[in-house]
């Protein structure tokens, strides 16, 4: 069980590392020749936020909160922390899809997809851990 709890830190830490990379978010700028200029940014960059692409920055902040909650849940395994962790992970995963929903596939990168998958994997792992904890509490 303890190894599983430490595995619980891998998904938020990896997603945070991917969010720091400068290839996570895309902005397409028009030019007179017709072919758009594609520029990529980090999830923590304020430039996409300034162009009304709010999803990446909100996802990055929620991932930081998720990592802190995960560390707290590993140190002090309380049911409340696990549930809060799951709620934040679900919201972060949904918000990470915002660029694809609002602007289309051209604004979604493979790194953005990996971040979304890591957040979903974290949510699934959290649900599995909660089910195990409930089963062990029922048998005791």
Question: Which residue stretches match the model-derived regions?
Answer:
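Membrane-interface extramembranous regions at the lipid-water interface
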Residues: 1-3, 79-88, 134-139
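Loop-to-transmembrane helix junctions at the membrane interface
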Residues: 54-95
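Hydrophobic cores of alpha-helical transmembrane segments in multi-pass inner/ER membrane proteins
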Residues: 8-14, 63-68, 117-131
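Structural signal for the C-terminal ends of transmembrane alpha-helices
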Residues: 21, 72-78, 128-134
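Alpha-helical transmembrane segments of multi-pass integral membrane proteins
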Residues: 95-140
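Aromatic-anchored segments of alpha-helical transmembrane domains
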Residues: 14-22, 91-101
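Membrane-interfacial loop-to-transmembrane-helix junctions in polytopic alpha-helical membrane proteins
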Residues: 3, 48-58, 78-81, 104-107, ...
């Amino acid at each position: 069980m303890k190894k599983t709890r430490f595995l619980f830190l891998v998904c938020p830490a990896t997603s945070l590392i991917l969010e720091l990379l400068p290839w996570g978010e895309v902005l397409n700028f028009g030019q007179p020749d017709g072919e758009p200029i594609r520029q990529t940014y980090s999830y923590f960059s304020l430039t996409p936020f300034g162009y009304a692409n709010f999803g990446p920055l909100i996802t990055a902040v929620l991932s930081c909160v998720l990592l802190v909650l995960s560390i707290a849940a590993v140190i002090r395994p309380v049911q409340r922390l696990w549930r809060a962790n799951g709620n934040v992970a679900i919201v972060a995963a949904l918000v990470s899809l915002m660029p694809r929903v609002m602007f289309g596939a051209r604004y979604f990168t493979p790194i953005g997809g990996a971040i979304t998958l890591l957040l979903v994997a974290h949510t699934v792992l959290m649900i599995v851990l909660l089910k195990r904890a409930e089963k062990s509490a029922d048998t005791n």
